[in-house]
Design a protein with these regions (language model features):
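Residues at or immediately preceding the N-termini of alpha-helices
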Residues: 27-28, 42-45, 64, 82, ...
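Hydrophobic face of amphipathic alpha-helices that form TPR/SEL1-like repeat modules
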Residues: 1-29, 33
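Glycine-rich loop-to-alpha-helix module at the N-terminal edge of alpha/beta enzyme cores
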Residues: 30-122, 132
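Rossmann-like NAD(P) dinucleotide-binding subdomain of oxidoreductase/dehydrogenase enzymes
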Residues: 123-270, 407
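Short, well-ordered beta-strand elements within core beta-sheets of diverse protein domains
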Residues: 34-40, 54-61, 147, 260-263, ...
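ALDH superfamily catalytic-core signature
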Residues: 234-387, 450, 496-500, 506-515
Length: 516
């Protein structure tokens, strides 16, 4: 039995005037409708931004330590509802339950970090070059934040935007992925019961085109001060262009083609463990999923053998069980992955499973656990012999597929790692500190792992990428405060006279001709 979900604007449920319904289904049982969603239109998004604007002034006047108490309450409610939230995530987006629990824990960790920032939204007291004059800096909220998020991390990633934005005194309009609407609804209920005033957090269920049209109108009317977007590079570029017309810099967290370099002296067992987790965890649908393993030619064959062995031994199937990964999130991603599989050519060697493509009774996988016909399950694929001009090498694949490419020198490995033009996450497995720091210095990624996988974020470390992975903005930790606050400087002259900077400064005359 499904529930009809409607947008929440100014604290009130607002069914869409457009009258369109979207059915969010369980990807492990695609006939199971998790929720029916009343899809909003562009006007609804504009109304949500108006409600946020109306609520923001009063919210910004709440002292930051008190706003921190609300964040603390959100964290406690998340902890209390951890299992229930994780079950919704597993059912709606097919994430294995153990991973879903980890995702919910990330929200609690984020709240634990930011509740203290309510007492640490520090400005500075700065000395002046004039007597009887003092200089200050202050952090002020930007105003109204519109956060547009994807469904591969349907509750953790939204918390990266919403929690610090609220803590800093902003009001938020959140547009979650419509195929993860039940997750968004459950998460919104946590915020609503934490004591947030009406209008401070608004939730709009809409598809991409209506969201873009609504955002465009809201920006024209001056109703939005900051846009955060997690999603594809192509859509992120359009949002960046739109915001640029209004002299705004959005926070863009986009795709990744994340490399893992495995050197000749690497611990291959550890490297394979990392490749298995980051390449196939969440069915390869993380922005930080491993794209290409770039392996020294002397150990490449052994690495491929071990990874093939580990992948074949892993259980794929029902996300409620103990599996490496479950189904793809939605039909749209299954369709996209089918296109990716078409990039495999005759010169590639394919490993990892008893077949390729969608798992079914006619295309079975050894050790599969679940109902293959019911869900969007796909074989894991290892493609050995990818080259720098291959589509598989150059593009984000968003599915359970890992490429393998050989290298001879570290210079060549770094060039290969940077070649696709993304810059989110990168990893190196080595025992040589000189290689570690050479790699760190020259890799374009915003995040680097050493002897660890390309996936895995901690709540107090900056998260974000460069190039095709983002515009340099960072989420998480103290660094995200610069996304949701603006610096204001103030000078206070209490001398009783006009003192002109640079012109009325007392000069001390040195004897620069002195020599010993």
């Amino acid at each position: 039995m499904s529930t009809v979900l409607t947008s929440v604007i100014g604290g009130a449920r607002v069914p869409s005037g457009a009258g369109r319904l979207y059915r969010s289904t369980d990807p492990s049982r695609t006939t199971d409708v998790v929720a029916e969603v009343s899809l909003a239109d562009a006007d609804d998004l504009v109304r949500a931004c108006e409600a946020a604007r109306n609520a923001q002034d009063a919210w910004r006047d709440v002292p930051p330590p008190v706003r921190g108490q609300v964040v603390a309450a959100i964290g406690r409610l998340v902890e209390a509802n951890k299992a229930a939230l994780a079950r919704v995530v597993t059912r709606e987006v097919g994430k294995p339950y153990a991973e879903a629990l980890g995702e919910v824990q990330e929200i609690a960790d984020t709240c634990a970090f930011f509740l203290g920032e309510g007492r640490r939204l520090y400005g500075h007291t700065v000395p002046s070059e004039m007597p009887d004059k003092q200089l200050f800096t202050f952090r002020d909220p930007v105003g109204v934040v519109t956060a547009i998020t994807a469904g591969n991390f349907p509750v953790a990633v939204p918390s990266w935007y919403i929690v610090p934005a609220l803590l800093c005194g902003n009001a938020v309009v959140w547009k979650p992925a419509e195929y993860a609407a039940a997750c968004a609804e459950a998460f919104y209920q946590v915020f609503a019961h934490a004591g947030l005033p009406d209008g401070v957090l608004n939730v709009v269920y809409a598809d991409g085109p209506e969201t873009f049209r609504g955002l465009e109108r809201a920006l024209v009317r001056g109703l939005v001060d900051k846009v955060g977007f997690t999603g594809s590079t192509e859509v992120g570029a359009r949002i960046g262009e739109l915001c640029g017309r209004h002299l705004q810099s959005p926070c863009l967290e986009l795709g990744g083609k994340n490399p893992m370099v495995v050197t000749e002296d690497a611990d291959l067992t550890l490297a394979v463990e990392g490749a298995l987790f980051s390449g196939f965890g969440t069915a390869g649908q993380r922005c930080t999923s491993l794209g290409t393993a770039i392996v020294h030619e002397s150990v490449r064959d052994e690495f491929v053998r071990l990874l093939d062995e580990a992948t074949r031994a892993a259980t794929v199937g029902d996300p409620a069980g103990d599996v490496l990964y479950g189904p793809l999130i939605d039909e749209r991603f299954a369709d996209g992955f089918e296109k990716v599989l078409g990039w495999i050519g005759p010169r590639h060697a394919v490993h990892g499973s008893s077949g390729t493509g969608r798992i079914s009774p006619s295309n079975p996988r050894d050790g599969f656990d679940g109902d293959a016909e019911a869900g969007l399950y796909y074989h894991p694929v290892i493609v050995d012999g990818v080259r720098p001009d291959d589509e598989l090498f150059l593009h984000e694949t968003f599915g359970p597929i890992v490429g393998v490419a050989p290298y001879r020198t570290l210079d060549e490995a770094i060039a290969l790692a940077n070649a696709p033009g993304y810059g989110l996450s990168a990893s190196i497995y080595t025992t040589d500190p000189a290689e570690v720091f050479a790699f760190r210095r020259r890799i374009s990624a915003g995040m680097v792992s050493v002897n660890n996988s390309t996936s895995g974020a901690e709540a107090h470390l900056p998260f974000g990428g460069n190039g095709r992975s983002g515009n340099g903005g960072r989420q998480s930790g103290i660094w995200v405060l610069d996304q949701f606050t603006r610096w204001q400087s103030m000078n206070w002259d209490f001398s009783g006279r006009l003192q002109k900077a640079q012109m009325d400064v007392v000069e001390i005359t040195p004897d620069l001709g002195f020599r010993l």
